[in-house]
Amino acid sequence: MTRDRQPPFVSSASGARFITGESFFAEWSDNVHSGSGPVLYRHAFPFPEIGPGLVTMIGGAPAAGKTTFSMQMGVEMVRFNPEIRLLICNCEMTPAALMDKTLSRLSGIDAHDVRHRRFGEEHADRLAAALATIETFVDRIAFMTAPFDIRNVAATADATGADVIVIDYIQRFTIPSDDSEARHRVNRMMDYLRRFASAGVAVVVISAVGRSRDRAGRSSYASEGLSLASFRESSELEFGADDALILAPVDVDDPEVVRLAHLKARHGMQVTQDLMFDRRVQSFSLIDPAPVAPSTPAVAPRRRTSLAAEIRLLWESSAPAADDASREAGSQSRHGDGDDAGEAQ
C-alpha cells in the first residue's frame, strides 16, 4: 500500500469516527497468533459464557427461580475466580434473604428452616461448614441498596471495584431521564449496560417475560412457548444482549424440572441445558452434562474505566428516544401543518 498509515481512531472534519482496517489488522492478527482467547469467568454451569465485555440476559417466569439461579451462578463465580468482585443489584430481596438462599444450598439445610432459624444439633456441622465457606468469599460480594437506578449501579460498581454486575430485574430499574414509558426506559437501560460491558465489566441481566400459548392453546409460561419475543417491554433486550436465555419449567405440572433455553449466542454455540431445581435447598443442578465444555479462560485484567464516566458520556452524546406522539408531531412539522397538511394526509 502506498498511502500513509492512518491512526487507529479517525475523527474527520465531518464528525465521522471510525477505525481503518489497515491500522486494526496488525494488532488483531497478533492477537490471533497469540492463542489467548477471551476472558471468561467459570461459574456453576458450563454455559452461558460470562466475562468482561459481555452482556448476558436471563429471562424467566415468576417463581421460575431466576434470582436463585443468578445468585448460585454469581456465588460460584467468586469461589472459582478469587480475583474478581461481584455486585448484586436486586430490587426485590434483601441481602439477608439472598444469603439465606446461599446458606441453604451450601449446607443442604431446608430453606424454610434457614429462614426461620430453626437449627438443631443435627444441623451444627453442616451450618458451621457452610458459614466457613461463605466467609472465604463474602468480602468480594457487595449488595446495592436503593435507589435502584443506573446512576447508583455505576457509582456502586466503581466504589466496590465490581468485575461482575447482576441486575435483578431490569424492568424495575430507572434511568436519568424524564421518559416514563417502560419500553423507552428499558431501551436506554440496555444502552447503559452495553457501555458498562465495553468498559470491561461482565453484566448479567435478569428480565421478566410475558406469557405465551402452549401446544394446547393455553396462556402459559411453559418453556415450549417462550422465545426471544417473550422478554417484556422492549426488543432492545434481545438485540442488546450477547447471550439471551430463558429459564422456565419444561412442564408446568412439574416445576422441579426446568429448561435454560439458550436462544441467542452472539459469539458462539447455543447450548440449552435441562436442570433440576431443588426448591427445598434452593439449588440448581444439571440433569445431563453439556455436550461440549467451554474454552479455557484467559487471565482476567484487573482494571477498567469508570462506569459513572460512561453514563455521563452516553447521556451527553444522545437524547432519550422520542415516543410515538413526538415522532408524529415532528413528521407533521416537517411536512407543513394547517389545511394543506390535513389534505395531504
Regions found by a protein language model. Name each.
Residues T56-I58, L87-C89, M144, V204, ...:
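Hydrophobic/aromatic beta-strand patches that form the interior of the parallel beta-sheet core
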Residues R3-I109, R312, S317, D339, ...:
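The Walker A/P-loop phosphate-binding site
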Residues Y41-P46, E76-T160, I175, D253, ...:
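Cytosolic-facing regulatory segments adjacent to core modules
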Residues M93, V201, V205-A208:
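Conserved H-loop
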Residues V114-G120, A142, T174-V186, G217-A229:
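Flexible beta-alpha connector loops of hexameric P-loop NTPases
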Residues R5-I19, S29, G108, V114, ...:
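C-terminal regions of RecA-like/P-loop NTPase motor modules
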Residues F69, T94-L98, H123-R126, D149-N152, ...:
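Helical mechanochemical/support elements of P-loop NTPase systems and associated helical scaffolds
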